[in-house]
Regions:
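Amphipathic alpha-helical interaction segments
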Residues: 28, 46-50, 66, 70, ...
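Hydrophobic/basic alpha-helical segments enriched in Actinobacteria
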Residues: 34-37, 59-60, 102, 129-132
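Short, solvent-exposed interaction modules
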Residues: 74-127
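Short, recurring structural edge motifs at helix starts
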Residues: 18, 36-42, 50-56, 98-107, ...
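Preference for long, well-ordered alpha-helical segments
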Residues: 112, 118-147
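Intrinsic N-terminal pre-sequences and regulatory tails
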Residues: 1-35, 146-147
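Acidic (E/D-rich), amphipathic helical modules within compact regulatory domains
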Residues: 37-86
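Short, flexible domain-boundary/linker segments around small modular repeats
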Residues: 13, 24-39, 89-104
Length: 147
């Protein structure tokens, strides 16, 4: 069955894929990240954008396009790919980059990256998330608790 996406409003997306429906808007995404990482909603929004932007540079352009189709509209601007191909970096590089951009310390940033990945897993269909995650080093996968 092909994936179908229908916008209910500017920030809410419903995605059907193999009978799976996911409904999450950007505000819910930020709220979930804030709760998981124990941050303010504003900090969670900044963190989410920084993490998604960095991770999008780490995966193929095709995977970024697939992820964009599955995200709430307000998060799409954070997800752009590197026209020169995926950029290689490890988890420590990601944490350092996001920490510098958000002003969070490295412990808060690591917890925040975990929160963004966990929330992303809930916000997009399982297949899309697994395809995205498969292009990241194993150390990124280890951040996620078992579903």
């Amino acid at each position: 069955m092909a994936t179908q996406k229908r916008a209910l409003s500017e920030s809410t997306t419903v995605l059907w894929n193999d009978m799976e429906m996911i409904l999450m808007d950007a505000h819910e995404f930020y709220r979930d990240v804030a709760e998981r990482a124990m941050l303010s909603k504003g900090e969670a929004a900044d963190l989410t954008r920084a993490v998604l932007e960095a991770l999008a540079m780490r995966v193929s352009a095709g995977e970024v396009r697939h992820l964009i189709r599955a995200l709430p509209e307000e998060l799409v601007d954070s997800v752009r790919w590197n026209s020169r191909g995926p950029k290689r970096f490890d988890l420590d590089d990601l944490i350092q980059s996001v920490s510098a951009r958000t002003g969070l310390n490295k412990t808060e940033t690591r917890t925040g990256v975990e929160a963004v990945l966990s929330t992303l897993r809930e916000a997009v269909n399982r297949r899309e998330f697994n395809d995205f995650l498969s292009q990241l080093p194993a150390e990124f996968t280890e951040l996620l608790p078992s579903p």
